Amino acid sequence: MEVKDILKTVDHTLLATTATWPEIQTILDDAMAYETASACIPASYVKKAAEYVSGKLAICTVIGFPNGYSTTAAKVFECQDAIQNGADEIDMVINLTDVKNGDFDTVEEEIRQIKAKCQDHILKVIVETCQLTKEELIELCGVVTRSGADFIKTSTGFSTAGATFEDVEVMAKYVGEGVKIKAAGGISSLEDAKTFIALGASRLGTSRIIKIVKNEATKPDSY
């Protein structure tokens, strides 16, 4: 797999709580230059970013982030607001308290409501795999499939761990046809990226891959 093919799967991400507009601009410029799938940025920057890229790049943002326990109504509003401001893709965090209470029906209904507001915009569902048992992850693969979401996503990048090969393997085995996989958090090498893609991920959430590609390009033997 060539580097350009990896870059096409990347949601080039900056979600730091202290992110400044010049830093967001750099993310947007790099994402456009390297033709990544999208740039994933805080919701407060979506309107300005959408105007800045002027249709040349998909803008992704997050809702219910990073803990997921805001109410469904709050997440629905966040979704509507983000789309009105120019977001093309929404990454939502599920309410893990519902999961731990065994209330998967509520999780599914919340995703359905948000997908209804997304309409043709892509919806990715963050399940925070590092907080799940294998059984919970398998159940959530079914929940996300039935809800009509476009992607199941491993991680926020703000919890105890990010994506693992094992979790992506489970997702690939149990998620339904038509639902794609996004691996996010801790993807720090091109080899890791290739492995995640080989295991079934079609999107990668990372801030590091472009930095790695830039460093490789500056080496004397690079071309």
UniProtKB/Swiss-Prot annotation:
Q: Give the catalytic activity.
A: 2-deoxy-D-ribose 5-phosphate = D-glyceraldehyde 3-phosphate + acetaldehyde
The cellular location(s) given in this protein's UniProt record come to: Cytoplasm
Q: Which GO terms describe its cellular component?
A: cytoplasm
Q: Which GO terms describe its molecular function?
A: deoxyribose-phosphate aldolase activity
Q: Which family does it belong to?
A: Belongs to the DeoC/FbaB aldolase family. DeoC type 1 subfamily.
Report the protein's function. Catalyzes a reversible aldol reaction between acetaldehyde and D-glyceraldehyde 3-phosphate to generate 2-deoxy-D-ribose 5-phosphate.
Q: What is this protein called?
A: Deoxyribose-phosphate aldolase
Natural source organism: Streptococcus pyogenes serotype M6 (strain ATCC BAA-946 / MGAS10394)
Lineage of source species: Bacteria, Bacillati, Bacillota, Bacilli, Lactobacillales
